[in-house]
Amino acid sequence: LDALRALGREHAKTHPNALKERTAAVSPDDLAILVYTSGTTGKPKGAMHAHKGLVYTVRGYNTLIARDDNDECMCFLPLCHIAERMGGEYFSLYTGAKLNFVENPETVPENVREIAPTVFTAVPRVWEKFYSGVMIALKEASATQQAAYAWAIGVGQRVADLVLAGKEVPAGLRLQFRIARALVLDNVRKLIGIHRSRFLVTGAAPISPELVRWYLA
């Protein structure tokens, strides 16, 4: 990366107006990328994406899930998919967030724990795998630990239900939730690697409402 930056600095010395010239040569309606569909319903089709469409989407996304250069994200879905191009690559370019690339698909759980992303986007199958990992660890825990988890997740789900219903969480339940997080739930988040996450995003396929409720808890 340092060598690449050095090449860029040298190029800038001999071509000081290169960026302005290249920007001026492109219009918002020009083709930015060509992304092929998966081919599940027929032959793969090349979807044309103009610059204005990509910029409009990224700006809109940032109003809902605001990122900045303090955020860390992960890239593990194929870049041939528009979801990873937009939510990972282009969104990080737009906001300055750090984009970490996983070593390979098999190391995703390990890399999540290592990086602890602040914004994490994944398909439902990944969220299901993380949940299954927690359940497997729970089976190997002591009876006391299992009882503590059952109480803590119950408190968290009561809070989640009230929040989803737009209702106020009573002071007593808020206190219980703080205790549940300190004793149990924060450790579950660390086990997955989402203890720093401000936003968890899912898409591309249906996800179980109960699984969403569990993560909210």
Predicted regions and their residues:
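Conserved pre-ATP/AMP-binding loop-to-beta segment of ANL
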Residues: 5, 9-36, 43, 66-72
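Short hydrophobic/charged patches on amphipathic alpha-helices used for structural packing
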Residues: 20-23, 109, 189
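Conserved AMP-binding/adenylation subdomain of ANL enzymes
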Residues: 55-72, 79-185, 193-196
